[in-house]
Amino acid sequence: MIIGLGIDITELDRIKRSLDKYGERFAEKILTPAEIELIPAKNPVPYVAARFAAKEAAVKALGTGFAEGITFHTIEITRLDSGAPQLNFLGKALERSKSMGVEGIHISITHGRDTAAAVVVLEK
C-alpha cells in the first residue's frame, strides 16, 4: 500500500546560479559527503539538481517538508551496482519513515536540458 508520494522538478539554471555563486558551500549544504564524492567534474549541475529534486520529493513523501529535524543531510541518494538510484533515510528522516511503517522505498530521477525531476513512493 502506498503511504507516501512526492514529486519535484528543479530548473538546472537555478542550481547553476547557486553553484556559481556559492560553489562548494552550496553543494555541502544540500549533499552528504558520500554524494559529494560522486559529483562529476565535467558537468556537475544535472547531478546536483537531480539530488536536490530527489530530496524535495522525499520530504513531500514523508509529509514533513524540511522540518522536525529532517534536513538535506538526513536524506541520501546513492547508486546500486546497476546504476539505479537508491534513497536512504538517515537520522530524523529514518525515524519518521519507521514511524510511518515504511517497508519499501522507490525513487526515479531524471534530467533533461533545462530541468531535473524526481518521484518518491513510500510503501507499507
Curated annotation (Swiss-Prot):
Binding-site residues for Mg(2+), renumbered to this chain: 8, 56
Cofactor section: Mg(2+)
This protein's record includes keyword Translocase: no
Reactions the enzyme catalyzes: apo-[ACP] + CoA = holo-[ACP] + adenosine 3',5'-bisphosphate + H(+)
Name of one Pfam family that matches: ACPS
Main localization of the protein described in the UniProt heading: cytoplasm
One GO cellular component term noted in the UniProt record for this chain: cytoplasm
Subcellular location: Cytoplasm
Gene3D superfamilies registered for this protein in UniProt: 4'-phosphopantetheinyl transferase domain (3.90.470.20)
GO terms of biological process kind: fatty acid biosynthetic process
Assigned keywords, A-Z: Cytoplasm, Fatty acid biosynthesis, Fatty acid metabolism, Lipid biosynthesis, Lipid metabolism, Magnesium, Metal-binding, Transferase
Top enzyme class: transferase
Highest taxon, organism lineage: Bacteria
Enzyme Commission code(s) on record: 2.7.8.7
GO molecular function: holo-[acyl-carrier-protein] synthase activity; magnesium ion binding
NCBIfam families according to UniProt: acpS (TIGR00516), pantethn_trn (TIGR00556), PRK14657.1 (NF011251)
General function of this protein: Transfers the 4'-phosphopantetheine moiety from coenzyme A to a Ser of acyl-carrier-protein.
Protein family per UniProt: Belongs to the P-Pant transferase superfamily. AcpS family.
Designated name of the protein: Holo-[acyl-carrier-protein] synthase
Biological source species: Maridesulfovibrio salexigens (strain ATCC 14822 / DSM 2638 / NCIMB 8403 / VKM B-1763) (Desulfovibrio salexigens)
